[in-house]
Amino acid sequence: RFIHKCCAMQFPPTSGPTQMQVQKLPTGIEGFDDVCQGGLPVGRSTLVSGTSGTGKTVFSLHFLHNGIKDFDEPGIFVTFEESPLDILRNAASFGWNLQEMVEQDKLFILDASPDPDGQDVAGNFDLSGLIERINYAIRKYKAKRVAIDSITAVFQQYDAVFVVRREIFRLIARLKEIGVT
C-alpha cells in the first residue's frame, strides 16, 4: 500500500508470475529481444535515441522489416529527413527488399519531410494533419508497427519547443489509443 499525505492508493500485488507483466512485441533483431526480455512493449511508444550515425533509422527499418517478414505485421515508416527513395536504397544495402513490401501494401512510407524551398510558419503549430495522415495509413494498411524518423527533425523546424513537445505528446497518445507499437 502506498500512502501519501492527501490520499491513499492501493496497487495490485507485484508477486506472482502474471502480476504486472508487460506484453512484449518481438523485434526479430538478433540479441535485442533477449536483452529486452522479449522485445518492445506492445501498444506503446519507445524512443530510440542516439547521435547521428548510431543506427536509429536502421533499427527502425529492421523492426518494421522483421515485423512484416517474420510476423506478418504491416508497418508504417514516417520520415522527416530522408526521401522514401533514399530509405529504400539504404534498406537494400542490408539485403532488405522494402520496395517489394511497399508494392504488397505491407509497408507504407509516409513522407513528412518539409518543403525543400523552406516554409513560412504562420499561426499555431500543430501536428493534427500529420496525426490524421498516420491514423489513415494505419487503418488502410492494418499496421501494427509504426516508426517515426526522427522526432528531433520536428523540433529543429520550429522555435516554439514547448508547443512542439505538446504536439509530440498528442501524437504519442494517439498512437497508444490506436494500439500500435
Regions found by a protein language model. Name each.
Residues 6-7:
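Cysteine-centered motifs
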Residues 25-29, 33, 42, 57, ...:
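Amphipathic alpha-helical transducer elements in NTP-driven molecular machines
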Residues 14-30:
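N-terminal pre-Walker A segment at the start of P-loop NTPase domains
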Residues 157-158, 163-181:
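Substrate-engagement module of ASCE P-loop NTPases
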Residues 64, 135, 168-172:
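Short amphipathic alpha-helical segments and helix-helix/interface helices
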Residues 35-100:
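Walker A/P-loop NTP-binding active-site region of P-loop NTPases
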Residues 71-156:
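Conserved inter-motif catalytic segment of the P-loop NTP-binding fold
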